């Protein structure tokens, strides 16, 4: 099975206006063809406007909104990415027909999020302000214990790191910086 790729936006890299987001994301999608994309912007007071633009960007990807089940349903997103504090919304999101990815940072959280379609597990490598990396051995161990599809996340910025996480049996890799730093954007 081909490793799935999951592009997560950050306003510092992809822009915080509709125009800059659309341009940067369109170029990254054209270059990398990610399987999934997520609009993540925890600080914007224009998230709905950005989400409307985000969901219209062409490509073969499946588009998720971060943290807002109701908006994802209203705007017709493919799914929603829930934080580790939002596991109580997994069932509601699934009932609404959304594909659900949940953020996890421990074995206990991964177990608690087992109703999600997939999880991110992080940080695998060093990532700014994300604490001590879990490392590849920990990732390999968790993929052996958890039946939920796992996206490795955190500090994945090179093709070599993607190959390393692939050997751990993950469903895919997720990254913010990989899609921006390895692109002609």
Where are these regions (language model features)?
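Alpha-helix-loop-beta-strand connector modules within alpha/beta enzyme cores
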Residues: 48-67, 87, 92-106, 132-157
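Acidic-and-aromatic substrate-binding clefts and catalytic sites of carbohydrate-active enzymes
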Residues: 14-16, 44-46, 181
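Glycine-rich phosphate-binding active-site loops on the catalytic face of alpha/beta enzymes
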Residues: 7, 12-13, 83-92, 118-133, ...
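N-terminal active-site wall of soluble small-molecule enzyme domains
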Residues: 22-96
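Short, basic/glycine-rich phosphate-binding loops at helix/coil junctions
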Residues: 1-7, 30-35, 118-122
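Catalytic cores of alpha/beta
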Residues: 24, 63-78, 104-117, 144-179
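Active-site mouth loops of central-metabolism enzymes
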Residues: 2-22, 99-103, 151-152, 156-157
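Glycine/Thr-rich beta-alpha phosphate-binding loop at enzyme active sites
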Residues: 75, 79-82, 101-141, 182
């Amino acid at each position: 099975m081909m490793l799935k790729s999951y592009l997560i936006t950050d306003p510092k890299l992809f822009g915080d206006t509709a125009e800059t987001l659309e341009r940067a994301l369109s170029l990254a999608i054209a270059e990398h063809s990610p399987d999934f994309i997520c609009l993540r912007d925890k600080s914007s007071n224009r998230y709905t406007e950005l989400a409307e633009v985000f969901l219209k960007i062409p490509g073969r990807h499946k588009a998720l909104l971060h943290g807002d089940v109701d908006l994802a349903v209203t705007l017709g997103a493919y799914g929603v990415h829930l934080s580790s504090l939002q596991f109580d919304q997994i069932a509601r999101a699934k009932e609404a027909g959304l594909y659900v990815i949940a953020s996890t940072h421990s074995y206990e959280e991964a177990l608690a999020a087992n109703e999600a379609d997939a999880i991110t597990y992080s940080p695998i490598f060093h990532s700014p302000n994300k604490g001590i990396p879990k490392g590849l051995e920990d990732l390999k161990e968790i993929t052996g214990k958890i039946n939920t599809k796992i996206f490795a996340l955190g500090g994945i910025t090179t093709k070599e790191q993607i190959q390393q996480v692939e050997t751990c049996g993950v469903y895919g890799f997720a990254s913010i910086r990989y899609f921006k730093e390895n692109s002609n954007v």
